[in-house]
Amino acid sequence: MNSIIELTDYYSSNNYAPLKLVISKGKGVKVWDTDGKQYIDCISGFSVANQGHCHPTIVKAMTEQASKLSIISRVLYSDNLGKWEEKICHLAKKDKVLPLNSGTEAVEAAIKIARKWGSEVKGITDGQVEIIAMNNNFHGRTLGSLSLSNHDAYKAGFHPLLQGTTTVDFGDIEQLTQAISPNTAAIILEPIQGEGGVNIPPKGYIQAVRQLCDKHQILLIADEIQVGLGRTGKWFAMEWEQVVPDIYILGKALGGGLYPVSAVLANNDVMRVLTPGTHGSTFGGNPLAIAISTAALDVLKDEQLVERSERLGSFLLKALLQLKHPSIKEIRGRGLFIGIELNTDAAPFVDQLIQRGILCKDTHRTIIRLSPPLVIDKEEIHQIVAAFQDVFKN
């Protein structure tokens, strides 16, 4: 294991500080390290493996398509893209979809759409379009996505970033109201902030944001890359708020844990600003990606993993709420997306949980984030709870 870590560290760029653990196999909820030790994976690649690791249905779809046709350019039609587009548009109740690869790439595309819509439809002078984002967000690390962040540490050394972006506190409707100007084209938010610490908005906040958008002719963009596709116990986390955004951004679990697939979805009145040449993607919507994503969506539906997430997530949250320890500040979550916020450094607790076979990670230093595959069962949840009880007792 040490030689693998040393080799990787020697050749890798230094933009990650990984746990000193080498994973070599995954199946369902579990992963194994190179020493053969088994873990319950409560990271899931940060909600990539919602369907579980190496789901046989998705693997089968991947291998069958890979042996037939993997890539063609979007200057041609493929035989499976249209059916996938119909499936995902019906799921999101949107007219159009733009298939892409990574989550941050989809955010970049949504920014472009919002800007073009702002100038062409709302009539904002080109170059003066503004987008409002939320403090403590995470939309990605490419320049456009990074421009939406308020984390100076993430942005240091990468200026100048996009102009016309501003951030306000997540959950503060008065601050958001004050930030809106005639040049505001879009408000982008995560319905539940993920990397920010599983932050759930105050009751009625998202509905109030929707009302502001309607009043001021502003697009509401929901970044559901991490929280969508069953993670919170709904197909889309916006469903918890009974709010329909103008634009959905999806990713992560859209590729079933096997392939990078992302998408931007909107209705005709928004998506029509994209015309030939205004956007493109070499790999977006390729036949292999589409075969995998189709199977990934089918597994979520056929195995009722969205409903399972709500049911078992509620069970897990209720059990964790019984934990008593002076270090625990708050435990919160929806579905199988749970944050345990401490009033101290979470890293030692994470280390102890990993030693007990629970693979997890801290975020923002004090929060333990749990997002196991949605195929988890009650016995595995009991093991997670037992590990937490043991760690906090000792």
From Swiss-Prot:
Q: Does the keyword Cytoplasm apply?
A: yes
Pathway given in the UniProt record: Amino-acid biosynthesis; L-proline biosynthesis; L-glutamate 5-semialdehyde from L-ornithine: step 1/1
* Alphabetic keyword roster: Amino-acid biosynthesis, Aminotransferase, Cytoplasm, Proline biosynthesis, Pyridoxal phosphate, Transferase
Record EC number = 2.6.1.13
Catalyzed reactions: a 2-oxocarboxylate + L-ornithine = L-glutamate 5-semialdehyde + an L-alpha-amino acid
The principal localisation class reads cytoplasm
Q: Does the keyword Cytoplasm apply?
A: yes
User: EC top class, in one word?
Assistant: transferase
User: Which cystines does this chain contain?
Assistant: none
In the record, N6-(pyridoxal phosphate)lysine modifications are located at 252
GO MF term set: identical protein binding; ornithine aminotransferase activity; pyridoxal phosphate binding
In terms of superkingdom, the source organism counts as Bacteria
The record ties this protein, via PANTHER family, to: AMINOTRANSFERASE CLASS III, ORNITHINE AMINOTRANSFERASE, MITOCHONDRIAL
| Function comment | Catalyzes the interconversion of ornithine to glutamate semialdehyde.
Question: Which family would the database say this protein is a member of?
Answer: Belongs to the class-III pyridoxal-phosphate-dependent aminotransferase family. OAT subfamily.
What is the protein's given name?
Ornithine aminotransferase 1
